């Protein structure tokens, strides 16, 4: 009887432990069709939260879009307020929604840590989310993209500068150049009024050197960039559109003063699209302030999901 009791106890424990292992194993794989948090995606030096949307119509070797929220925003708010999850169901890509760890939920685009490749800041944490997702879902590393609005657009430019090897393209909605919000006190999540008010003005070559210094040993290809901004933005002044386009024109070696083309009323009335080359476009929205509309269908074209 004693032996039988031990055997029954052992079997019960084995079944319970196995069930727990299966449950825990499943918990590591986010459910498709809903926004899910991933708590263990590797090194997370700045405590950024990771949320992910895996579509029910997941492509084999899917693409990835990193969608970065604005100040006061959250992953949930950007998931609900942007078109990327819905577009993921159509095109089969995965969406990563990082969430800022700071009060007010702006992003750290000001410290040396975040402005340095593998420097231990927010950019480092977000890059590790991309690496985890690529491995977990056997994603196509040539189809990884980044976009964001306001503070998220600032981080989009920072990600393109600090991790150019990870991204094929970026789209920044109402941001500033990478490095423009640098804090002289090396404070994360700092506000830079000089930059915000469009007073940080320099040459394309100087802006390019700032971006390139964030990953100084890198000599590979860089993500093509599309820059949106409203021409009556009073939060991040419209001069930041000019300076951001200068920065990427400098990076790509384009003559900022001689764009290839400028199209009026594109992608909508009173908006204009300027193209400097295959790797850089700027869209200036006439009569639009800081709350600029995301153009999901246009984003899909820039990212190569549609023609």
Swiss-Prot record:
Q: Name one Pfam family in it.
A: Esterase_PHB
**According to its UniProt record, which residues of this chain constitute the active site?**
150 (charge relay system)
Q: Which domain of life is it from?
A: Eukaryota
The GO cellular component terms are: extracellular region
Q: Which residues form a coiled coil?
A: none
InterPro entries annotated for this entry? AB_hydrolase_fold, Esterase_phb, Plant_Biomass_Hydrol_Est
Asked if Signal is a keyword of the record, the answer is yes
Q: In the UniProt record, which residues carry a glycan?
A: 192, 270
Q: Annotated pathway, please?
A: Glycan degradation; xylan degradation
The subunit field of the Swiss-Prot or TrEMBL record says: Monomer.
Write the protein's name.
Probable acetylxylan esterase A
Organism per entry = Aspergillus flavus (strain ATCC 200026 / FGSC A1120 / IAM 13836 / NRRL 3357 / JCM 12722 / SRRC 167)
């Amino acid at each position: 009887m004693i032996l039988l009791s031990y055997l029954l106890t052992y079997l019960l424990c084995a079944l319970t432990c196995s069930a727990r292992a299966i449950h825990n194993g499943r918990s590591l794989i986010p459910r498709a069709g809903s926004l899910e948090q991933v708590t263990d995606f590797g090194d997370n030096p700045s405590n950024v939260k990771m949320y992910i949307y895996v579509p029910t119509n997941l492509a084999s070797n899917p693409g990835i879009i990193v969608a970065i929220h604005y100040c006061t925003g959250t992953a949930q708010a950007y998931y609900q307020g942007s078109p990327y999850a819905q577009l993921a169901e159509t095109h089969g890509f995965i969406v990563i929604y990082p969430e800022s760890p700071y009060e007010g939920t702006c992003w750290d685009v000001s410290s040396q840590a975040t402005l340095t490749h593998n420097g231990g800041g927010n950019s480092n944490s977000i890059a590790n989310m991309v690496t985890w997702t690529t491995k977990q879902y056997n994603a196509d590393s040539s189809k990884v993209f980044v976009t964001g609005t306001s503070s998220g657009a600032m981080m989009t430019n920072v990600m393109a500068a600090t991790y150019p090897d990870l991204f094929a393209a970026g789209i920044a909605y109402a941001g500033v150049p990478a490095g423009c919000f640098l804090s002289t006190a090396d404070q994360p999540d700092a506000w830079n009024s000089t930059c915000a008010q469009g007073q940080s003005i320099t040459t394309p070559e100087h802006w390019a050197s700032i971006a390139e210094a964030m990953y100084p040993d890198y000599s590979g290809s860089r993500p093509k960039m599309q820059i949106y901004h409203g021409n009556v933005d009073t939060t991040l002044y419209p001069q930041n559109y000019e300076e951001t386009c200068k920065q990427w024109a400098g990076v790509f070696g384009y003559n900022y003063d001689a764009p290839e083309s400028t199209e009026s009323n594109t992608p909508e009335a009173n908006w204009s699209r300027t193209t400097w080359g295959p790797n850089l476009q700027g869209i200036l929205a006439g009569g639009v302030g800081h709350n600029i509309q995301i153009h999901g269908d246009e984003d899909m074209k820039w990212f190569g999901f549609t023609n």
